[in-house]
Amino acid sequence: MNSLSTIAFSLGLLLVTATAFPTPGPLGEDFKDDTTSDRLLLTSPDKTEALIKYILGKISAMRKEMCEKYDKCENSKEALAENNLNLPKMAEKDGCFQSGFNQETCLMRITTGLLEYQIYLDYLQNEYEGDKGSIEAVQISIKALAQILRQKVKNPDEVTTPDPTTNASLMNNLQSQNDDWMRNTKIILILRSLENFLQFSLRAVRIK
């Protein structure tokens, strides 16, 4: 799938999800203009899984590209561990692990985490030197996934959106020490962290 068709697919997906669900409250600026109509089958577990797998596939391709182009592979693990970018992660209290699984708590954490990742994807959009269409496709699809999962939460108004001031501070932190090595290290760390977060999310939506 080329860049243009990838973006077109993702834009279509976001349009479908935005018009398919009633929005009880704001979910960030991107969802304020949602319209109300009948729910689509996109909320079914298999459709949600398919979307997560699609995003994971795009991330895997970008990681492979970084590995081949900049030699940023598993040998970067130690260096990456030293870079604290405050990336969203799953913890025991989030209720997403099989032991102590709590669907409501977990869905809330996944949805919030996906919204928190948007600022990191903004950074990738600016700094990633590979296929820009892949980054845009991931960002659009993450927004669509957050919208889908929000409809599964019993109290969607309680889903918190990132504070603009916090996001601005995060972006400043990301853009600091932005020489080629650090930039590429940050990119691979963000991709790896998002991949792990989505893999936890995939397992969580499968738990009945």
Swiss-Prot record:
One cellular component (GO) term of this entry: interleukin-6 receptor complex
Lineage: superkingdom: Eukaryota
InterPro entries xrefs: 4_helix_cytokine-like_core, IL-6-like, IL-6/GCSF/MGF, IL6/GCSF/MGF_CS
Subcellular location: Secreted
GO molecular function, one term: interleukin-6 receptor binding
Primary subcellular site in the record, as a coarse category: secreted
Disulfide pairings: C67-C73, C96-C106
PROSITE patterns, per the entry: INTERLEUKIN_6 (PS00254)
Pfam assignment, any one: IL6
Single Gene Ontology BP annotation: response to activity
Glycosylated sites: N167
Keyword annotations: Acute phase, Cytokine, Disulfide bond, Glycoprotein, Growth factor, Phosphoprotein, Secreted, Signal
Signal peptide from the UniProt entry: 1-20
Keyword Disulfide bond included in the entry's annotation: yes
Residue positions where Phosphoserine is found in the record: S76
Family according to the record: Belongs to the IL-6 superfamily.
Known partners and oligomeric status: Component of a hexamer of two molecules each of IL6, IL6R and IL6ST; first binds to IL6R to associate with the signaling subunit IL6ST. Interacts with IL6R (via the N-terminal ectodomain); this interaction may be affected by IL6R-binding with SORL1, hence decreasing IL6 cis signaling. Interacts with SORL1 (via the N-terminal ectodomain); this interaction leads to IL6 internalization and lysosomal degradation. May form a trimeric complex with the soluble SORL1 ectodomain and soluble IL6R receptor; this interaction might stabilize circulating IL6, hence promoting IL6 trans signaling.
Function, in words: Cytokine with a wide variety of biological functions in immunity, tissue regeneration, and metabolism. Binds to IL6R, then the complex associates to the signaling subunit IL6ST/gp130 to trigger the intracellular IL6-signaling pathway. The interaction with the membrane-bound IL6R and IL6ST stimulates 'classic signaling', whereas the binding of IL6 and soluble IL6R to IL6ST stimulates 'trans-signaling'. Alternatively, 'cluster signaling' occurs when membrane-bound IL6:IL6R complexes on transmitter cells activate IL6ST receptors on neighboring receiver cells.
Protein name, UniProt field: Interleukin-6
